[in-house]
Amino acid sequence: MASILHYFLALSLSFSFLFFLSDSVPIPQHHTNPTKPINLLVLPVQNDASTGLHWANLQKRTPLMQVPVLVDLNGNHLWVNCEQHYSSKTYQAPFCHSTQCSRANTHQCLSCPAASRPGCHKNTCGLMSTNPITQQTGLGELGQDVLAIHATQGSTQQLGPLVTVPQFLFSCAPSFLLQKGLPRNIQGVAGLGHAPISLPNQLASHFGLQHQFTTCLSRYPTSKGALIFGDAPNNMQQFHNQDIFHDLAFTPLTVTPQGEYNVRVSSIRINQHSVFPPNKISSTIVGSSGGTMISTSTPHMVLQQSLYQAFTQVFAQQLEKQAQVKSVAPFGLCFNSNKINAYPSVDLVMDKPNGPVWRISGEDLMVQAQPGVTCLGVMNGGMQPRAEVTLGTRQLEEKLMVFDLARSRVGFSTSSLHSHGVKCGDLFNFANA
């Protein structure tokens, strides 16, 4: 009996040692490639309380491990840190000038002088990866390995089995890209941009799905949201006996040369007051091309400096001046929470003057900066930001966002899911995910 106890004690200590050795967590190997056609794929997503950004546990390698990665709507591909504790029986590094390198749109050859390991081989392809928070870049090795994700038929809240992509392309990026800006313990970034080897495009290609994905980001760190790959509006119509997709409004979606998702905003109104007079709406401030980027790499809306100044002025005019208090960094306009019952709503008129309206409620804009002080969660992006308007995670949370890449359009909920009595965390049973 003593020898058995010693055995189990040693086994327990071994597992504890392995857990602390790596941020990646092993998972049970229950996965399959079903014969039934796959309608949808689901990746659970969590809200990081300290940053307001969203991350997911990707299931990769052989044996499968959970790898925590930031969700980057505009990223070109998946990149992970391979320098520490990357162990897999199925990792491969495609040779330079191979078809995999062409698919990844890279023709740069890379050779690592050290001993071979994931991320370090001779005569492979180099792929540039970016930390979307700091914009720092680094060159890494193009690799391929197993990726697993939950399948579902969309008619149930239960997640289906794990299905696999045996040779999923990604970058083994240098570890210094993880040093700043990312949530704690993150080991990489999952790019959802419209690029050849982004997560949505590889999944659609491998499983024969529609080139479409839906985001439902949870506002609450204690519940999970989801990324849904495939045609969710036609496969998830009924939820609690109601069609949660019925109030979607669509607007044209453009993709920049960098693979970023942009929409056109025709005008901005605060409590029906125009931020600019009508004859200036299409000026370079808002931009004839729209200049509005949808992003998950910032929690707050970001405006070009001139637009920010006009926006905050009109917003402040809608509230009593005596309610304003000293601003709390990094915010520029703050209020005494006890003196205000309701905050103005903001309407973004999409595409053209009579286009669909994206309404941003006070809940989607305001941030409690400290006890008794609530601030406008809109940031000054300076004179030359990446886009005149950037919509952040606060504007995307608790809404259905459908990125229909095949039709070059994006659908957005014209009301919060809360109006249906549900949250993003209710869409699926994530208990075992």
Swiss-Prot record:
InterPro entries in alphabetical order: Aspartic_peptidase_A1, PEPTIDASE_A1, Peptidase_aspartic_dom_sf, TAXi_C, TAXi_N, Xylanase_inhibitor_I-like
Quaternary structure and partners: The mature protein consists of high- and low-kDa subunits linked by disulfide bonds.
PROSITE patterns referenced in this protein's UniProt entry, alphabetically: PEPTIDASE_A1
Coiled-coil positions: none
Name used for this protein in its record: Basic 7S globulin 2
Signal peptide: 1-24
SUPFAM superfamilies assigned to the protein according to its UniProt record, in alphabetical order: Acid proteases
Classification of source organism: Eukaryota, Viridiplantae, Streptophyta, Embryophyta, Tracheophyta
Keyword Signal: yes
GO biological process: proteolysis
Record bears the keyword Signal: yes
Function: Seed storage protein. Has a protein kinase activity. Binds leginsulin.
Recorded GO MF terms: aspartic-type endopeptidase activity; nutrient reservoir activity
Segments crossing the lipid bilayer: none
Residue ranges of every copy of the Peptidase A1 domain listed in the record: 54-413
PANTHER family documented for this protein: ASPARTYL PROTEASE-RELATED, BASIC 7S GLOBULIN
Keyword tags: Disulfide bond, Seed storage protein, Signal, Storage protein
Annotated family: Belongs to the peptidase A1 family.
Pfam families found in the cross-reference section: TAXi_C, TAXi_N
